[in-house]
Regions:
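Conserved small/polar residues in nucleotide/adenosyl-binding loops
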Residues: 1-9, 179-182
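Transmembrane alpha-helix interface/packing and boundary motifs in multi-pass membrane proteins
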Residues: 4-9, 84-94, 130-135
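Multi-pass membrane catalytic core of lipid/isoprenoid biosynthesis enzymes
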Residues: 34, 39-66
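Interfacial segments of multi-pass membrane proteins
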Residues: 42, 65, 101-134, 147-155
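Helix-coil boundary and interhelical linker segments in multi-pass alpha-helical membrane proteins
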Residues: 62-78, 110-118, 154-164
Length: 182
């Protein structure tokens, strides 16, 4: 339905393409249709609109999903994973998927009031960007999502959230490896 179409939209690709006639997949070395490239090559407006849309892509289905599904049920796992998977692997579209980092943050924020997973992800991104600086960005993202998943598995008691976060980490790590092999 409409949700399937929405989660597969690469807003960070389409917004700069529509507003500035820029294909952000052809300019940067990583060819990633991500929010950081929308900011860098499309400017502030393209970047902020992309950020809002990509966060919403993950937030809306998870936030609404927990209103109608029991988050303790394994049926909640696909609700967590679908926006990230749809961004990383946008079937039936000519564009290559993105790393799904921003969509992952949206999913985790959608777990409100349970924000520990989102805080873990933000903490490790900041830690590996400011305290122990890891470059290139793809390696930073791989380590961040690895530590994020490990901490969720250790501290979050809800199995569906543990499994969903683990699968999200695997998807993003795989996507980062795809982009570094280009």
């Amino acid at each position: 339905g409409l949700g399937d179409v929405y989660k597969r939209q690469l807003f960070a690709y389409w917004i700069p393409k529509t507003l500035k006639n820029i294909d952000i997949c052809t300019i940067p070395e990583d060819h990633n249709p991500g929010v950081s490239n929308a900011f860098m090559y499309g400017g502030f407006l393209c970047g902020i609109l992309s950020l809002i849309c990509e966060l919403a892509k993950g937030f809306i289905p998870v936030y609404l999903g927990q209103k109608y599904l029991d988050i303790n049920s394994m049926l909640f796992v696909p609700v967590l994973v679908a926006p990230v998977f749809g961004h990383a692997f946008p079937f039936l579209q000519k564009e290559k998927g993105g790393k799904a980092i921003t969509a992952s943050f949206g999913v985790l924020l959608g777990l409100f009031p349970e924000l520990h997973p989102a805080v873990y992800l933000a903490f490790f991104f900041i830690f590996f960007s400011v305290v122990v600086i890891i470059n290139p960005h793809s390696l930073r993202s791989i380590l961040t999502f690895g530590f994020f998943a490990f901490n969720v598995l250790l501290t979050i008691k809800t199995a569906s959230i543990q499994i969903g976060c683990f699968i999200i980490a695997v998807i993003v790590i795989y996507s980062c490896l795809l982009y570094t092999s280009d």
